Amino acid sequence: MSYNTVQYLKTDPRARYQGYTFFFKEGLCWSDINTTFLKCRLKQKSINDVKSMSLYGLTSKVPEYYIICLINSTLMSYYVDNYVNNTQTFQINDARQLPIIVPSQDELDELRIIFEDAIRIKKSSNNAEELQTLQQRLDKTVDRIYSIK
C-alpha cells in the first residue's frame, strides 16, 4: 500500500478508514466463519479485514499467545457454541464475552511451550498425529486453569 493510497483512504469521504492505529501491528486473528471448533492464529503485521477478526494484547499478564491458546481450546469452542453464539460466525463482540482467567506464571510458561510447539509442528511437518497430541495437552492445561475436571 503506497503513501498516496493511505492518504486517499484517510481523506476521501467515501472511504471507510477505521482502526488504522492497529494497521501493521502483530496480534492474533481468526476467520469470521468457522466450524464448532474455533481456530486462532498469530497475526503478522498487516492491514485488518472483516473476514479475519483481529485482537491485540494490551497487557503482559494476558499475552497474545495465551489468548490464542484459550481460543484454540475445546473448552472455549464449546463455551462459545453453547453460551455466546451457536452460529458459524465468531466475531469481535463474541470474543469480548470470553471469560479470561489471568494465569499464573507457571501456567503462562506451560502454554508458551505448547504455543511454540504448535508453530514448530505446523511449519515443519504439519503432522496430524502430533497436532492431535498437542491439542490434548492444550485442552488438559486449559481445563486445569479453569478448574474443569
Task: Locate each region found by the language model.
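Polybasic, glycine- and aromatic-enriched phosphate-binding surface used to engage nucleic acids
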Residues: 1-109
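Non-catalytic DNA-recognition/assembly elements of restriction-modification systems
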Residues: 102-149
